[in-house]
Amino acid sequence: MKLKEIALFNELASGEAGEVEITGITSDSRAVQRGFLFAALKGVKADGAVFAADAVKRGAVAIIAGKDTAIADAGVPVLHVDDPRHVLAIAAAQFYGKQPEVMVAVTGTSGKTSVASFTRQIWAYAGFPAANIGTTGVFSPTRSDYNSLTTPDPVELHRVLAELTSEGVTHAAMEASSHGLDQRRLDGVRLAAGAFTNLGRDHMDYHATIDEYLGAKMRLFNALLPKGAPAIIFADDQFSAQAIEAATLAGCDVKTVGRKGNFIALKRVEHERFRQHVEVRIGEEIFEIELPLAGDFQVANALVAAGLAMVTGVPAAAAMRALALLKGAPGRLDLVGATEDGAPAYVDYAHKPEALENVLTSVRPFTTGRVIVVFGCGGDRDKGKRPIMGEIASRLADVVIVTDDNPRSEVPAQIRSEIMAAATGATEIGDRREAIFTAVSMMQPGDTLVVAGKGHEEGQIVGNITLPFSDHAEVAAALAARLEEHPK
């Protein structure tokens, strides 16, 4: 592809510059190969302009940079633009050229992964070759690629979308994080619909205020969705009204789900141990669903996913039937096993205050004994949530064990102390493996254990090193060791 064939560069790349052949695109100078277009982006920690010379040395034939970015004597065309992140996303979309016919995106603090996964499953039930992209990876009829980035950078995203299209995928659901939206990673995606789940405290190390955080998420509606496109909004969150207003002002076709929903109205929920009986109204029809998932938050996620599926071609009756067959996303209230007495042990990704509150509230109805929770907070991230999560854990669980969870460059004991300050009666065990084994060893009949924070993750980040670690594997090992000591 020639540089001038990327529509945005028609005028900027005139003459000989426009004839330059582009063989790839990247914003990482280390990934540059001969013929690449390099995007010199300003980041929080570094300015890509510093690496422009290195990119050229590695083979870059053109550079995208901001209008206020000076790159002297580059030796290749430098295209100065108002919003280089937006331009990078559009260029990546044009370079790779293909994406599934039907694309939807979901934003919100919690539930994005589950909604994207559930939407894929409902589409698949209805006969559409479908995929989902997000925190747990890329899942389609032909692949299960695990990674840990909620919204991939635009080059990687469009490479994956092109591959999925070549594999025959026609429908894809993706997560839209506030970082991804703010950094324009989705700007080249042609969306058919969008969704909002909820808003709580998260990423306060990146966004200055909750209003700024909400504003980043609302870019999905006011910048990315075409006018008239459906916006599925969970109606029962404290920020639902703001999301509805933003989507309405953006010209979206707003459809709400939940107890206050006007599209899918939740009428009744009856909790059982590992499933829930749900009654909803859609138009004039009443549907009874046996949802094979625990927790009110999973009901909300399922309804948002059903809404997305319905506005993209799935009949209501088929969508409701599909809900009875849903499987939880990896690491989302994931039942690992049980003790010899039948006390269940779960792993959950909850690493934010609202998510921790949701999961602990969800297991309470079917817990006849104690709720036991093991959790920690990440280093180099929002410090303000640590005492908040400590208070939530001590209020909603009967036994709290505070441990380490990706301390990164911080002193682990300091992180734990900030949690412990508000976690009345909690036990502190820094070693996460020891904390899990201790929790499993103390389980009694009727108890429920939740190990929160990592979910699907397979590592513990200490300093700059990621050490192999799986909550799922450690809980399974602890249960196995217990069963050896106490056979049924």
Curated annotation (Swiss-Prot):
Q: Which post-translational modifications are recorded for this protein?
A: Carboxylation is probably crucial for Mg(2+) binding and, consequently, for the gamma-phosphate positioning of ATP.
Known pathway: Cell wall biogenesis; peptidoglycan biosynthesis
Q: Which PANTHER family match?
A: MUR LIGASE FAMILY MEMBER (PTHR23135), UDP-N-ACETYLMURAMOYL-L-ALANYL-D-GLUTAMATE--2,6-DIAMINOPIMELATE LIGASE MURE HOMOLOG, CHLOROPLASTIC (PTHR23135:SF4)
- What lineage does the source organism belong to? Bacteria, Pseudomonadati, Pseudomonadota, Alphaproteobacteria, Hyphomicrobiales
Q: What is its EC number?
A: 6.3.2.13
Name the chemical reaction catalysed here.
Answer: UDP-N-acetyl-alpha-D-muramoyl-L-alanyl-D-glutamate + meso-2,6-diaminopimelate + ATP = UDP-N-acetyl-alpha-D-muramoyl-L-alanyl-gamma-D-glutamyl-meso-2,6-diaminopimelate + ADP + phosphate + H(+)
The Swiss-Prot or TrEMBL record describes its family as follows: Belongs to the MurCDEF family. MurE subfamily.
What InterPro entries does the record point to?
Answer: Mur-like_cat_sf (IPR036565), Mur_ligase_C (IPR004101), Mur_ligase_C_dom_sf (IPR036615), Mur_ligase_cen (IPR013221), Mur_ligase_N (IPR000713), MurE/MurF_N (IPR035911), UDP-N-AcMur-Glu-dNH2Pim_ligase (IPR005761)
What are the binding positions for UDP-N-acetyl-alpha-D-muramoyl-L-alanyl-D-glutamate in this chain? S29, T150, T151, S177, Q183, R185
Pfam families recorded:
Mur_ligase, Mur_ligase_C, Mur_ligase_M
Gene Ontology biological-process annotations: cell division; cell wall organization; peptidoglycan biosynthetic process; regulation of cell shape
Q: What class of enzyme is it?
A: ligase
User: Sorted alphabetically, which keywords does the UniProt record give?
Assistant: ATP-binding, Cell cycle, Cell division, Cell shape, Cell wall biogenesis/degradation, Cytoplasm, Ligase, Magnesium, Nucleotide-binding, Peptidoglycan synthesis
**Full protein name:** UDP-N-acetylmuramoyl-L-alanyl-D-glutamate--2,6-diaminopimelate ligase
Q: Which NCBIfam families match?
A: murE (TIGR01085), PRK00139.1-2 (NF001124), PRK00139.1-4 (NF001126)
Listed under GO cellular component are:
cytoplasm
Chain residues that bind ATP: G108, T109, S110, G111, K112, T113, S114
